[in-house]
């Protein structure tokens, strides 16, 4: 995607982003990998424009809304027992003082099974019981479930006060995700 930006006026950012989609038939490569590349270039151009103007990127796009951004701790592990995961994440929480945690659930990409049998259901309850209501909890299933299992897990998450359920069904299955 970079060649579509070379030699062009960075101040015309909206036009550049629109044009890159059709440049050399880039539209054939639509999807996350393509748009991630565009986003990296767009962020770099915003940074360059801000430096040239001696202003923050926030100022360039209408003013900063906050001076601090809350972070969450994200675990990428699925091969642990709930007890191992809560202990490991708890150590990271003590180090980082994060106010939220995102845990991995399911077996990844729709097989309705955990890598450790029963892990998801036990982890959902154990994490909330261990950390209480003062910590915001999220889960990411990476498309682990069909719609029936996703609804079942979603109800457990609601019952335990989780804030979000990321990608319960495979992302390309729009009907099941509804």
Role assignments for model-derived ranges:
Residues 36, 42-80:
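Glycine-rich, aromatic-flanked loop segments that form ligand/cofactor-binding clefts
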């Amino acid at each position: 995607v970079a060649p579509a930006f070379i030699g062009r006026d960075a101040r015309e950012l909206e036009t550049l982003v629109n044009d890159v989609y059709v440049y050399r038939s880039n539209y054939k490569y639509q999807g996350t990998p393509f748009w991630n590349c565009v986003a990296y270039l767009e962020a770099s151009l915003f940074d360059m424009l801000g430096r040239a103007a001696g202003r923050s990127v926030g100022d360039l796009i209408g003013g900063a809304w906050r001076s601090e951004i809350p972070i969450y701790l994200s675990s990428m592990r699925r091969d642990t027992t709930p007890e191992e995961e809560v202990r490991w994440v708890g150590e990271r929480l003590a180090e980082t003082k994060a106010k939220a945690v995102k845990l991995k659930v399911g077996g990844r990409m729709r097989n309705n099974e955990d890598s450790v049998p029963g892990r998801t259901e036990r982890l959902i309850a154990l994490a909330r019981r261990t950390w209480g209501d003062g910590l915001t909890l999220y889960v990411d299933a990476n498309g682990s479930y069909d719609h029936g299992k996703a609804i079942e897990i979603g109800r457990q998450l609601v019952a335990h006060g989780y804030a979000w359920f990321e990608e319960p069904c495979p992302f390309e299955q729009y009907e099941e995700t509804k």
